[in-house]
Amino acid sequence: METKQFKAESKRLLDLMIHSIYTQKEIFLRELISNASDAIDKIYYRALTDEALNFNKEDYYIKIIPDKEKRILRIIDTGIGMTKEELEENLGVIAKSGSLAFKSAHELKDGYDIIGQFGVGFYSSFMVAETVTVISKSIDSESGYKWESTGVDGYTIEPWDKDTVGTEIVLRIKEDTEDENYSEYLEEYRLRNIIKKYSDFIRYPIKMDIHNKRLKENSEDDYEDYVEEQTINSMVPIWRKNKNELTKEDYDNFYMEKRYGFDKPVKHIHISADGAVRYNAILFIPERTPFDYYTKEYEKGLELYSNGVLIMNKCSDLLPDYFSFVKGMVDSEDLSLNISREMLQHDRQLKLIGKNIKNKIKNELMSLLKEDRTQYEAFFEAFGRQLKYGIYSEFGSNKDVLQDLLLFYSSKEKKLVTLDEYISRMSEEQKYIYYATGESKERIEKLPQTELVSEKGFEILYLTEDIDEFAIKVLMSYKDKEFKSVSSSDLGIEDSETEKNTETEELENKELFEKMTALLSDKVTAVRISKRLKSHPVCLANEGEISIEMEKILSAMPNNENIKANKILEINGNHQVFEVLKDAYKNDSEKFGLFTELLYNQALLIEGLPINDPVEFSNSICKLMI
């Protein structure tokens, strides 16, 4: 037996790897299984050029054997094995990757790839084991060797009888502590869960002897224990299968198996890319919003695999926030991993994959919009708000990606329409895309501000969600047509005769409007004759970037109480109320003041805004009734 020291800065570096690099102890099994898979891959590559070596895939597997009584966990593979020199080179030098060296020396063909990159995964076993023993026999050696270490300073190596080629790793599992339950790594159910989670798509069978119960023969209630060897992993991932061989049911089953949601997906996207970066992906657009979707607790991201091995549960960098509802996975052989294989280095490949995925999602949603409008509207009901947030955020930089996906209720069509559909129906005389805001389409339909636009025969988009107008403000225009609120001070559709009559009316009643403006000086910026009202007596219009609807939303937020829209009180000069108002101005200043307050409060109520003093409002009505 030889005793040797680690060649790298042993204790300090090993301690760093055990305690700092890996964030989850269960990762050790993933790393050891990946190493075992690498070892079998190496035989496969040798067989490509060595005619004397026959690669029969059925002869190659990985076996996991827990022994609770002895606190031993064995990981056995039928791979290429290691010579004494390779044991010292690969296990005696921390951060030395045998897989990487093999990969550099051989041209990889036939869709296979070696998983290992850094050679540190093996040492993750010291997170759960007090002693690690490696017994290996190389395909190039007549004898086997045993390598053993406690992970403290060095290791021992000695010849060992081993009949078959391959490697057996023996972990003596640590005793439990108050903080750590190491015994769980000897439980069948726990080991199965870890394998399914991280290594389900390793291309070779991962086998375990599973203990179970069954009815004894010729018995109805007497059970017996039995042990059955089972293959735990799926081996062939769905994303590597030919799309033409898969059915919608196959994708739906995968969606349910991965627990992406309890609904059925609206759409699946299967990507196989071989360009600047190679990757496979299966993405799903859910039917319903998760219960926590619009909360801080919700985490976006796709499962990320490196050559079939799960390395991240939720890689947020692969999805923009506005597509955070998308579920699924990405598998690539080209990713640059960091030393622990748990995290990605933010490299060009990841950005390319993310950009490609974004474009694929956009294209699929556009296809759904055109080919299955009912299904798209159901999707939009669930996630349309997120698309609008995507336009509003980041100063509108994403509007070109998202604007064609938006739907709004149309006053003319009485259904949801796209901006492009709205534009296609515009007459030559219509300059703007008109919209109205409110809590519901029923309330918007009753708004006085819609009268003139509707009379002109122009279509109005109804904005009923809090985010709607903020998104529209960021969009500013669509295909060179500006958006215009029906509450805007200038609608751009008043004819010259109306303009002339309004100017005349305002000049004749200049002092009246000045008096009303003075009485409401802390509430409105001006009072004037309305160009838009037809049957209603009064309404509010606004000037500036903050609309009345935006004021309602912003003022409800913390520290935003003082954000106000620049309101204009508009009076219908053709309404009987205006005649009463003029009479009061001439003959009864007290009544004129009451009328002014009442008309303003009436306009507030129409907009769904609160009255400042409901008691005073009620008293004013009573005074006028007496």
UniProtKB/Swiss-Prot annotation:
NCBIfam families to which the protein is assigned, alphabetical: PRK05218.1 (NF003555)
Places the protein is found: Cytoplasm
Primary location recorded for the protein, binned into one broad class: cytoplasm
Residues covered by region (B): 342-552
GO molecular function, one term: unfolded protein binding
Protein's UniProt name: Chaperone protein HtpG
Gene3D superfamilies: 3.30.230.80, 3.40.50.11260, Heat shock protein 90, C-terminal domain (1.20.120.790), Histidine kinase-like ATPase, C-terminal domain (3.30.565.10)
Family: Belongs to the heat shock protein 90 family.
Function per UniProt: Molecular chaperone. Has ATPase activity.
Keywords from the named record: ATP-binding, Chaperone, Cytoplasm, Nucleotide-binding, Stress response
GO-annotated cellular components: cytoplasm
UniProt-annotated stretches for the region A: 1-341
Subunit structure: Homodimer.
